[in-house]
Regions:
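Alpha-helical transmembrane segments in inner-membrane proteins
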Residues: 1-332
């Protein structure tokens, strides 16, 4: 029964992603029909203005697929490592930590390339994840969902104040950082795709390899240790994969919130907690969600556009509140 549900969910997710891909290419300041999109993708028919529009939008769509998949898988890994349903790069303050290191790089080292952003974002995200989990673990009951959310909010607020302190004195730094901070895939190019793709492949392969150990970890630290699992090593590898996926995407697209929260949580409700199924489905679902958000941003903001990070925040904030209410977590 569960296998049948998984197959149906996977088929529906893939169909949804294909639709979002076509919509992402078709919609914009100049709308293009689906038949034209399909002909252009396969280089059928004559060279027209519409075909050129389609070809110009393909990099944005491909980058959106990689970015959405990376953020969603990162969220699934963080939820599994912390055994916490609300773990997410944005809620845990990881995005803000990456932002702080990036703005420091812009202000003090005058960096301006995505390849340089990536390693700064990775360092900031990793240090923030360790800090937040350490703060949430203080006191009884360990890192509960509410304590993680509070620690993430506190760390995020403190780090954001540092971001503002570094950014505000310089108009040039502010201008360069401001557009990046909103979270957007609109300016993506094939160069960005070539930068992001290796990190996605490495992070995704490591996450798939960690699926079985993470299933064992879900039984609890003591039970997992009794079954022969190296718990610290499992957490370390899974966390590194999650931070790598999140940081590389954040460096190139800016901080995009709630993708890593909504998608894995939804699939966990539908197909259960098996990470072997959740991780690949999260990749497909995250890609579809980010493309949907990007497309809606273009439609709602026409003739301009809303950044995809704003749209995901508008969708994700109510979902976050519903998850918190459903969890009914009262312990601090």
């Amino acid at each position: 029964m569960r296998d049948r549900r998984f197959l149906l969910t996977a088929a529906a997710s893939i169909m949804l992603l294909l639709f979002c891909v076509l919509a992402s290419i078709a919609c914009g300041s100049k709308s293009v029909g689906f038949p034209t999109v399909i002909r252009s993708l396969f280089h059928l028919g004559e060279e027209t203005f519409e075909n050129n529009v389609v070809q110009a939008r393909i990099p944005r769509t491909v980058f959106g697929i990689l970015a959405g998949a990376s953020l969603s898988v990162s969220g699934a890994l963080m939820q599994a490592v912390t055994r916490n349903p609300i773990a997410d790069p944005s809620i845990l303050g990881v995005n803000t930590g990456a932002s702080l290191f990036v703005v420091c790089g812009i202000a003090f080292f005058h960096i301006s390339k995505g390849s340089q952003y990536i390693w700064l974002a990775f360092a900031g995200a990793a240090l923030t994840a360790v800090l937040v989990y350490g703060l949430a673990s203080i006191g009884g009951n360990g890192a509960t969902p509410i304590k993680l959310a509070l620690a993430g909010a506190a760390a995020g607020t403190a780090l954001q104040s540092l971001v503002n302190t570094v950014m505000l004195p310089s108009t040039q730094v502010m201008d360069q950082f401001r557009f990046w901070q909103t979270g957007n895939i609109g300016g993506a190019s094939w160069t960005d795709i070539r930068l992001l793709a290796p990190y996605f492949v490495i992070g995704f392969v490591v996450s798939i390899c960690m699926a079985a150990p993470l299933n064992t970890l879900a039984l609890g630290d003591e039970a997992a240790t009794g079954l022969g699992l190296n718990v610290p090593l499992t957490r370390a590898f899974a966390s590194l994969a999650g931070v790598l996926l999140c940081a590389s995407t954040t460096a190139l697209a800016g901080p995009i919130s709630f993708v890593g929260l909504m998608v894995p949580h939804l699939f966990r409700l539908v197909i259960g907690p098996d990470m072997k199924k959740i991780l690949p489905l999260s990749a497909v679902g995250g890609a579809a969600l980010l493309l949907f958000a990007d497309t809606m941003g273009r439609i709602l903001g026409s003739p301009g556009e809303l950044e995809s990070g704003i749209v995901t925040a508008l969708i994700g904030a109510p979902v976050f509140i519903l998850i918190i209410r459903k969890a009914k977590v009262k312990s601090l």
